[in-house]
Amino acid sequence: MTLARHVIDRCNLTILLEPGHEDLAEFLSRHEVEIIASLPCYSARNVNEQRGDGVFDASIRALQLLNRLGYGSDGRLPLHLVYNPNGTFLPGPQAELEADYKAELQQHFGIVFNRLYTITNMPIARFEGHLRHHGQYDAYMDLLLRSFNPANVNGLMCRNTLNIGWRGEVYDCDFNQMLDLQWRDGGPRYLWDIDPAQVEGRAILTGDHCFGCTAGCGSSCGGALAAP
């Protein structure tokens, strides 16, 4: 029996191999849950530098497990990967990166997947701390501002998607949740406080980080927003 809703799991690949979670991949496949998983590069060195030693090998084994269950080849089990740059630059063209990923992962590991989504590094949280520590914050923000692309604005995920926290908090996007920019009308707003009829036309809470989604080809949970 499958779930009655289209469910997407923003999956940490390595958790699929952790003790106590051995049945998670099979559970997701049985319920036809779409998987979107981060793999910052198809190179072991780059992934391990960004995520820690051993993460690349564990991610590859997890992807091979998902492939054995039908993910990436069975139309009912979509498997998408997410790329974000390992540095202070914008993602390259999504279609070209997807072709490279598919060729490299198939050739070296026999892995197949459906789509690759490119996401810009947002100047918040740990990445903001890294930028400030190395004196690169102002230069990176200047890059985002200079790369503003008005063609991305209509497709911004904050204009058609809500983010709901685990306690019911309502945010305009994932990044606003990380910054605790919760909806407020005299106080915090929760999912059960919201009248759907009042959502359309509501002002979106914005900040400097929003230029990350409008730069270059754009960025969203579904990848690039505009053609290169």
Outline where the language-model segments fall.
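Flexible mid-to-C-terminal extensions adjoining Fe-S/redox cofactors in radical SAM and related proteins
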Residues: 169-228
